[in-house]
């Protein structure tokens, strides 16, 4: 075996197996790469090698193992080797009191993609020198802080001496820039801003670091405060100068540098806008600018530094910041200090009196943290530091122990490419550099690191025009590189002589090279990169024999149609090993000498259950199962004459026994047996040897002596009983003595007086409509001596205003089951996850609680199992308020109350319920009309809350009373004080009555979900809330249905809600055990809140039927089978349908003559084919059609059937369901006109559920926590076509909350919400738009719906000085919402306009107007010239325009009539909504059916997007339905076509490549097909297209996967009977474009929500949308949540199409597309982004459609902004993304091509 493992072939095989198992199959990257040279090959992957052997015939670029296995000589394999060499390594000396690292120098060279690791050691001494520099805010508000600092000199010096014996201390002060607006620039204020103060300044180094503490305090005494004007201070200037001016400050080289930053204000930062007025726009140069007096001199010329700059410079100079700030500014610095790897933050008191304690605490905290960073790292190298022993903090630093050497692991990796560019194609400075690996407190390791990008040596030694290449090419790296026009291995084949294919024809075939290759100069060059071989390419290397699905058992390779096995393997499919290693037994022999080894397996000579199948050894486990027991009786009778076989039966034993003095040890024999003899109670032993099956001549060895126990000591028993009785007597005396002492202490005045417990209040008045819960926390106080523990028992009685009420209720029915509420305090702390239902921790504890409590309470007769178990915390519970409180409910008879109470008190007193630990002293047991409980006062606790139930019932009196009473103190010496509490609950007028529609509902198990409507009758239009829960009856939770519980909240105006309960499939065992019993369960409403009341019925019974499911499963069979023979029954008479709700229709009829056995109802959506109808079976002449679409027309008919078959159907009846409130409107879009004016638009609700009649827009101010400030203003838009609003006079720099909701005939739907601050959004370079037919509202106006102007047909002229636009008196109007474009011809003509989505208006013009419809979404344009002469000529648009639009390539061509152009009204735009996909109910989300619907196609301008006349359009949707784990049904809708269809073509293949399968369907009426033999868990792409006489139409594409469980050994074989579901992969997230310059942009996206495999990276394609250039591709590696790519080299005003798709382990996923244009405006400082719209004459492809919501799974509309972005702030408004930018990133982007290495928080870049 050792020799086998040492074989070089085995090592090679292991290398191949390991490389094949790597992620992404890295071995194939070298093989699949299309390279032309050795250097290109080496750069493909770190494992790639190149064979330079001239005689080598295989692929030269492959892994080293593969080229060696293919026959390349070892000396001809060229591999670039990486290296790592330590150049300086001085060992750490722990006796030195300074920081040290090891090693100090290192040189490393890595191949692209390669990673090397090494160990890095850091030592920090116990005590090190400290430099402490105090930087203090000297604004006037810090005057008291300065006074205190002057007085605490000795304390600070004392603390420093405790920290270290070697320290220095310095002091600096700062205020702000002496400029507007930071400082008051009046002369008198510049001289003395405050009384007795110094002139304002920016920063001054007052005291450099010094060891002389006395000198420090003397200089500090002379300092005076200064002042400035605005609140934020200029501390960032001071911090930067303190860091870079090392000589002026006095920082020492080997000391710990601490910078104390003390302030009570926020800070200015780079580009925050404060310096604009003073003209300070230059960036900080990061240099020292202190004069001789220590003052900062460049405050008037340089901006503040940024946060990343400070982080970098402080780390570079080993400076650790300590932020000592007051509560006022704590929130600013709480986030700021997290950007520093090692820092501290402390709360400074208002007068800085605690600064010494704060410094001491911060120093000890900082000393325990160490940060290691890689500085000056080139772009091509990545460094990561980890540790196996040290823990990382939130900021990335390590927790260390000073005085010990810390060991760290450094991972250095060379990246392969950056933003799609290979690292070897980058600049030299990006490939190599000197990396400084630096710890926080000391100097670090210097690494000379580089990426290996050298050329292959063989390419430098090439033979130019070599004779080996017939002087027609260069010989290089073992092969010829031919000149142009020549090919072949020796360049002997001219590319012009490839026509003769006769030598490449195989006998009997008509295709050259068997159709698998290309004939070149009489030789076949096979396709497939080695797949096909042979002289005629006749051998397919994928067709060799397989074993377990693996080609050649993965132990060989396929060559010439046969398996060529690796060494050590043989057989037709390499499935037989030559080694006998698997046949070696435990003794080292072959098959134990009882068989022979063949093909790696032992074949035993004889079959026996005692031998194993592997090595023919004795199966000892089989022997031991009964061997000792079988021999026992015979050994007992022969050796001792006892046992069950003593006497004559002993002669039947077929072996003899032999008595011996000693037996062999157990490990030396087959079995060692011991048994006890029943006659004398002694133990005898014997052994079994041989093969374990004694024969007639066998002998069993028996030990002569038995082992007997000594005589028992019976006299000990009476003594133990006597001692036990004595102990019980002593305990009884002690208890009596303690009770007597307790009684005596109660009589003493000193012990009894004041030690009392009682309620805090004696009366509470509650109003039911204001109550948010059904309980009340009643405080109970303890006064006097708080030592010791007291427990108090209490009770509460309901309805005390009705005497005898509780007694009468209890005597109604003693055996009736009622719910009892139980609360206990567990002996474990409460966590956040315990209070979240559904978490794993909560579920585990719930199961533990219910199991133990059920075990205890089952001893009470009639008690059911617990339900509704929840966990919470109890505030004001003394020292145990962090413990977990469990609330649960158990059903028990009404008469069991006392038994439950006694049992609960007993178990609480014991502290456990079975194995569940509980805290003694607390419980609550709630019955129907009363409750009892106990609370505990721990030692030192003065107040606890008693949570009492309030018994809220719908039948309560308008004013009911409850009485809480403290009963006694069972534990403790306290006496009861205030014992009674009266609670009065006043019931006012309810806001609404909530109930079910009916008391009983019937559902089918096949529906999978039971939908139970809940209605509210509104009395007062406010909020109402009720709780709901399910209860078992004959149906059982988790077996027939999934139990649910929760709360329903009705908002104002809502009258209808729906409860959904998931139904479970009936298991076979359930159907056998429970038979045909009707399953039913209850849904109960309870606990009304916010003034709600429960109406009748408040309990609904849900009956689960099985017949409907059977009927529905037979729909296809019934519809496909021929009609049954009709009997004598006639058609049902007078069919009548009436809508019973938004999703229900009541259908009834009169029975026909005869005796019908039942009726069959057929119904479908009006307009659909009758073949898609649903069938229902009914025994009575009426039926309830449920689960329908709201506001939808249905057709239905009915027939009767009897014993002889069906009768004729009745006449057709139509009925429309009622309306239902619409869903929330589509995404909100904001067009920011100025800082106080915005244009708000929204999309129609996805589910209109009726006819939209109006929209309501609300907006109002919000604070930083997004909470409303003041009332919201409302605007009613009563024209549903107007989905746009212009809002003026908003407050500048203030965030607003906007909400939009829609209304139809059923009422108002839910709101769509967005919060936006206009000041943070980029402004459009355009004038205020004039928006026809758009409401314009004034934010400063009054309330309600009165303060807005609605302009329908008038043209608006808005002077710059006017707040409101004026109304034109033009009388020309347009109807039906059409829009006129004005074509100006003079400077005075009005040409501004705004086009909205289906929003129209008129414009004045001196020329003839043409009617034209705009189809873009929410865009604003400024047109200066637009001409059109006739229908055939194209219009012109000049360069002078600006757009910010979204792509709508499906433009609408105008139809010209009477000099005007208009759009046919039958065309519609928009995305598919659920209501448009008829035939599939919206509520039936079946997991085995997926619909892929596209946008309705519309032709674009200039060209007909549907192609030639008569060519079919694209099928409008694909529907996939799983039929099994390997088969599915593909359906589609018939496309539109002007000619008759001839048939369809369905193509499908694996998404990651594979054979294309095509199915031709000649029948145009067949719109579905069943596809079999698919692979489970593999993604397939399907394409469907239609054919007419004019040709094939465009195809509809969809990707689908059948997910199922597979066999572990055969991943392509599904497990029989396992579940299967469908899934479809998603595309990457919405594309976000950001302009960087006129010729470059940044593209970012989010990872797909559901990719088809593990993501390896992304592929980005960029090409001109209208052609004209080659496509460019970029690769982005990694799976970051948000990826981005900078694309340079673009052209202005040219539309580009971008595609992004994820590269996964399964191949490439679906694409996300977007078309974008970088458009420039004359005179504008920056470019802006736009998308192509229908107003241009550029012909766009019709498939580039855009959906106006980012929730689409096919395409997305990118929300675009002009200007530059920093990816830190995100605004979400209905799925759209926008990003904010800072000035810092503007300048950096223009200089570094869009690279940004540090993210920033919006707290520091937004004011």
Swiss-Prot record:
Residues reported in the UniProt entry to bind Mg(2+): 139, 141, 233
Extracellular side stretches: 28-713
Glycosylation site list: 327, 492, 580, 619, 697
Residue segments, region Involved in NRG1- and IGF1-binding: 194-199
PROSITE patterns found in the cross-reference section: EGF_1 (PS00022), EGF_2 (PS01186), FN3 (PS50853), I_EGF_1 (PS00243), I_EGF_2 (PS52047)
Quaternary structure (record): Heterodimer of an alpha and a beta subunit. Beta-4 associates with alpha-6. Interacts (via cytoplasmic region) with COL17A1 (via cytoplasmic region). Interacts (via cytoplasmic region) with DST isoform 3 (via N-terminus). Interacts (via cytoplasmic domain) with DST (via N-terminus). Interacts with RAC1. ITGA6:ITGB4 is found in a ternary complex with NRG1 and ERBB3. ITGA6:ITGB4 is found in a ternary complex with IGF1 and IGF1R. ITGA6:ITGB4 interacts with IGF2. Interacts with TMEM268; this interaction prevents ITGB4 degradation.
Gene name per UniProt: Itgb4
Protein name: Integrin beta-4
Highest taxon in the source lineage: Eukaryota
Positions carrying Phosphothreonine: 1418, 1514
Family label: Belongs to the integrin beta chain family.
Post-translational modifications: Palmitoylated by DHHC3 at several cysteines of the membrane-proximal region, enhancing stability and cell surface expression. Palmitoylation also promotes secondary association with tertaspanins.
Segments traversing the membrane: 714-734
Membrane topology term: Single-pass type I membrane protein; Lipid-anchor
Residues in I-EGF domain copies: 458-492, 493-538, 539-575, 576-617
Pfam hit, one: Calx-beta
Region (Palmitoylated on several cysteines): 734-751
UniProt KW Ligase keyword: no
Disulfide bonds: 30-48, 38-456, 41-61, 51-72, 245-288, 458-477, 469-480, 482-491, 493-521, 504-519, 513-524, 526-537, 544-558, 552-563, 565-574, 576-599, 583-597, 591-602, 604-616, 628-673, 634-653, 637-650, 682-708
Organism in which the protein naturally occurs: Rattus norvegicus (Rat)
Function: Integrin alpha-6/beta-4 is a receptor for laminin. It plays a critical structural role in the hemidesmosome of epithelial cells. Is required for the regulation of keratinocyte polarity and motility. ITGA6:ITGB4 binds to NRG1 (via EGF domain) and this binding is essential for NRG1-ERBB signaling. ITGA6:ITGB4 binds to IGF1 and this binding is essential for IGF1 signaling. ITGA6:ITGB4 binds to IGF2 and this binding is essential for IGF2 signaling.
Record remark: domains: The fibronectin type-III-like domains bind BPAG1 and plectin and probably also recruit BP230.
In-chain residues carrying the UniProt-annotated modification Phosphoserine: 773, 1071, 1121, 1386, 1389, 1405, 1425, 1776
Domain (PSI): residue spans on this chain: 29-73
PANTHER family: INTEGRIN BETA SUBUNIT, INTEGRIN BETA-4
